[in-house]
Amino acid sequence: MNTCRKACSNVSIKALVAFFVAVFAVVVLSGCASQSYTPEKKQSILSASALHTDGVLRVGVDASSAPYAAQSQGDIMGIDVDIAAALADEMGLKLELVDVGSNVDSAFSQENVDIVMGVETTSTAFWTSEPYMESAIVLFASDPSTSAPTSGSFTIAAQLSSMSAWQVNDHFGEEHLMSEADLKSAFEDLQAGKVNYVAADSTIGAYVAHSLGIEAYPVALLQDKTEYRIACPSTASAVQTAVTNSLTTLQRGGIITVIENKWLGEMTPLSNLPRVTTTVNPPENDSATTNEAGSNAVTADEGDDEDEE
């Protein structure tokens, strides 16, 4: 589906189960303390002929791309899942999730979904919405007022053999890189003051830090942003209109931000971050940046650590 999320597909979902269980346990327990409330069901804005199943929005997600979507105890959970649920509710429809992997074209032709979440590419074969999320490899620091390093002695932690580590080596040099087995270790070292920064995908990094209760803030971009959109068949004009209108309502009403904050904590918009442009080790082959597994930072080793705890 996209470079970063393809890397996520190589990550063991076992590593994320502990994080998902903890997050959802808090949500469930919080709900138990409040009075039950059932909102009035909205009228469907799409006719039966516009959908594969009358009254149901079939949504394709990549269930190997945590924290956007991942299997946990038999359910698919994540940011894209929550946004899809909000979209379905706004359209007056029930939600049905389908794990379609990263192939958008086959999702429509073989899985019979109405929309697909988390699409980065554009194609004449399908329509895409305006972006609803964005990500990039960034530098995290313990203090939000921290600037990106320009000289002197500093250390940046990044997951071993990841695109984040490659970016650190490219922009600052190998002497400033501390390779870590997983992002959990990297953020714990940041919290302990053993490193000055952590380099990681903005979404994955924020998710791990937030789940661990560690204060870490993105302070600089190490690459251009990637935007994530919703796709549907190019011939499905009614669905396109419904997605456009519903997504706009959710964005203007702050619902997307609430969902992001639930999973990631409050974050500085990437558009507000400065871009590091210095390069000390220009790459010989740009394609190397797209072929590294593990660039999104959560590994099976990290999951084993969580299980032991």
Where are these regions (language model features)?
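C-terminal motif of bacterial Sec signal peptides marking the signal peptidase cleavage site
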Residues: V27-G31
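A ligand-binding cleft/hinge motif common to bilobed small-molecule-binding domains
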Residues: S106, V119-W127, N196-K225
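Short helix-initiation/N-cap motifs at beta->coil->alpha
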Residues: E96-S109, M178-A192, T226
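Periplasmic-binding protein-like
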Residues: A63, M133-A141, A206-T248, E266-D286
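Ligand-binding clefts/hinges and TM-proximal coupling segments of bilobed small-molecule sensing domains
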Residues: S34-P39, Q167-S185, T248-E309
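Extended ligand-binding regions for polar small-molecule ligands
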Residues: A33-Y37, V81-E90, G152-M163, R229-L270
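Extracytoplasmic small-molecule ligand-binding "clamshell" domains
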Residues: Y37-V119
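Flexible hinge/capping segments at coil-to-helix
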Residues: E130, F140-A157
